[in-house]
From Swiss-Prot:
It catalyses: K(+)(in) + H(+)(in) = K(+)(out) + H(+)(out). GO terms for molecular function: potassium ion transmembrane transporter activity; symporter activity. It comes from Brucella melitensis biotype 2 (strain ATCC 23457). This is Probable potassium transport system protein Kup. GO terms for cellular component: plasma membrane.
Length: 651
């Protein structure tokens, strides 16, 4: 009944909405229609993929300068060193690592940490639990990032009020909370109608970034000398202790880079790469170098350089545009959180969650109430607790650097096991990435006491929850399997002592088709009847994102009364059992929903001292199982056709 652990349902449901567009644009390289599709996808990528990294200039350069200052004093070499570090970090991590390598490690067109985990688990058969653990850690860190991004992004934009109208400073936090509460409150309405403007707004944002930066580069054109890596190396070597702390702040310029890979299934590789190389990367560099030039010529203006370099007549529009951009960035992260949560459910590393579709036309538009509530509460608590974006900066880096580190480790396995690269070719590249990732991770991990504990705490709790669910479902499967009777034996006994036969079809959901389903055993025990046709149904999640309808169902006739059916879904597909069973007509079984009853087992779990898990983990697993979404709704079975049979199990 549940998807197998070596299957996958990762990726983003938000990706589904763009999937059909992607297919038409990803293969042809000529023709006017393709060009228009590519432009549309590039514009869409600006609104979804680059919202997070695109709003980093608001606070990243400021935080790096604060870290680099000695006794509050910044030398020219410090400013050039910081902007040089940002340039080379964006070049090496985003342009080289993600654009040239990670984006090529797709799982049938899909990306994201869980999709990468699925790809690697399929190639590395020997240690599935190790890869599963790495994937769980990556997913947990993603959720840690998803909590911090809306908080720091919107808060940093609202801090522009301190420049526009200093008397409004006390309202920065309340205004941020109001915006975030509103954002999370409207999620259930869907974002389809407003999402169409995300791309144009972010395009305007990047133009504003580039234009404001280019204007101020002329304040001190010598700032362009920082393109030379000499300034970055000199900054790192002259004062290593200060530089080490600064590196942690420099990383803020790259937060959101993982979205390039996570949203691969939304738009495809080409639009994401082109948006980065043509628009995002140039505009980010212009803005960072513009901020550096502005500070070099206005030494006293290092407090909020992003807003301070904006002309007074444009301040209010820029604050409003920044707020819109950060809300869009937050929306992209929220959508991504829904997607990863759904993937985790399909991979059976999270309990079933209620998933609501907010669009009849676009299946990728989903809303998960529980994720929305918990995420919204966590974001608001962070804003109220930290109050300033500077205080949140320390918490931000740990989650993202950890996620990038996990990606690098899995990328090595992809290179050697899937791309069949020689170790001598893959290892130098991966070691280079690991050195950079470890430098950033270690520079951020020392900030645990400054706020890093928040992201570590969130990730740790989520790892415990996911691992408890994985471990608990395994123990439950082993426990129930011991008590189950082989299906062969039951069929043989019924052949000798046939029960009363009643008309209709009974479908019994089970995770093990070789054993008699619990619901079947209880039906025979209490009702003493057997339907004319009995289907032993198993639902499996494949290790690829999509499974074609032609490959959805496998049917084998057991005997005249019993049939074995296996339904396979991709990890990007929402299981719909009645619709999938309808496909069995071409295989010789005429499925009729009006004459079919679905028998499900509802287990009542009790903690046991002999479960093999600590008592606290038993209780946590039982809580997760009790609060899981109803199987009837999850598999989209009509409630009027369902018979639930309860059993009690000591785990």
């Amino acid at each position: 009944m549940s998807g197998e652990l070596n299957g996958n349902d990762t990726s983003a449901q938000a990706a589904v909405s763009a999937g059909s567009v992607l297919e038409g644009a990803a293969f042809a390289d000529e023709g006017e229609q393709h060009n228009e599709s590519m432009k549309t996808l590039v514009l869409g990528a600006l609104g979804v993929v680059y919202g997070d990294i695109g709003t980093s200039p608001i606070y990243a350069f400021r935080e790096a300068l604060h870290a680099a200052a000695t006794n509050g004093i910044l030398a020219r070499s410090d400013i050039l060193g910081v902007v040089s570090l940002i340039f080379w970090a964006l070049t090496l991590v985003v342009t080289v690592k993600y654009v040239l390598f990670v984006l090529r490690a797709d799982n049938n067109g899909e990306g994201g940490i869980l999709s990468l985990m699925a790809l690697v688990r399929g190639a590395l058969k020997g240690r599935p639990d190790l890869i599963l653990g790495v994937g769980i850690c990556g997913a947990a860190l993603f959720f840690g990032d998803a909590v911090i991004t809306p908080a720091i992004s919107v808060l940093s934009a609202m801090e522009g009020l301190e420049i526009v109208a200093p008397n409004l400073t006390p309202f920065v936090v309340p205004a941020t909370v109001v915006i975030l509460v509103t954002l999370f409150s409207v999620q259930k309405l869907g974002t389809g109608r407003v999402a169409i403007v995300f791309g144009p707004i972010m395009a305007l944002w990047f133009v504003a970034l580039g234009a404001s930066g280019l204007w101020h580069i002329f304040d001190d054109p010598t700032v362009m000398a920082a393109l030379n890596p000499y300034y970055a190396v000199r900054f790192l070597t002259v004062s290593p202790a200060v530089a080490f702390v600064t590196v942690g702040a420099v990383f803020l310029a790259m937060t959101g880079a993982e979205a390039l890979y996570a949203d691969l299934g939304h738009f495809g590789r080409k639009p994401i790469v082109r948006a980065w190389l043509w628009i995002v990367f140039p505009c980010l560099l212009l803005n960072y170098f513009g901020q550096a030039a502005f500070i070099l010529s206005h030494g006293e203006a290092a407090a909020l350089p992003f807003f301070q370099m904006i002309p007074s007549f444009a301040l209010w529009p820029m604050v409003l545009l920044a707020t819109a951009a950060t809300v869009i960035a937050s929306q992209a992260v929220i959508t991504g959180a829904y997607s990863v949560a759904r993937q985790a459910v399909q991979l059976n590393i999270l309990s079933r969650l209620e998933i609501q579709h907010t669009s009849e036309k676009l299946h990728g538009q989903i809303y998960i109430p529980r994720v929305n509530l918990l995420l919204g509460l966590a974001v608001v608590i962070l804003v109220l607790g930290f109050e300033k974006s500077s205080n949140l900066a320390a918490a931000y880096g740990i989650a993202v650097t950890g996620n990038m580190l996990v990606t690098t480790v899995l990328l090595y396995i992809v290179m050697t096991r899937i791309w069949n690269w020689r170790v001598s070719r893959a290892l130098p590249i991966i070691l280079g990435f690991l050195v950079i990732d470890m430098l950033f991770f270690s520079a951020n991990i020392i900030k645990v006491h400054e706020g890093g504990w928040a992201s570590i705490g969130i990730a740790t709790v989520l790892v415990l929850i996911m691992w408890t669910w994985v471990r608990g479902t395994r123990h439950l499967f082993q426990k129930t399997r011991k008590a189950e009777v082989p299906l062969d034996l039951i069929v043989e006994q019924m052949a000798k002592r046939p029960p009363t036969i009643v008309p209709g079809t009974a479908v019994f959901l089970t995770g093990d088709p070789k054993s008699a389903p619990t619901a079947l055993m209880h039906s025979l025990k209490h009702y003493k009847v057997l339907h004319e046709n009995n289907v032993i149904l198993t639902v499996v999640t494949a290790s690829k994102p999509w499974v074609a309808s032609a490959d959805r169902a496998r049917v084998s006739q057991y005997n005249e009364r019993f049939m074995l059916v296996t339904l396979t879904f991709g990890y990007m597909q929402q299981p719909n059992i009645p619709r999938a069973l309808g496909l069995c007509r071409r295989l010789g079984w005429k499925f009729d929903i009006m004459t079919t009853s679905f028998f499900l087992s509802r287990r009542s779990l009790k903690a046991s001292v002999h479960s093999g898990m600590p008592l606290w983990q038993d209780k946590l697993f039982i809580l997760l199982a009790r609060t899981a979404s109803d199987a009837t709704e999850y598999f989209q079975i009509p409630t009027g056709r369902v018979v639930e049979i309860g059993t009690q199990v000591n785990i």
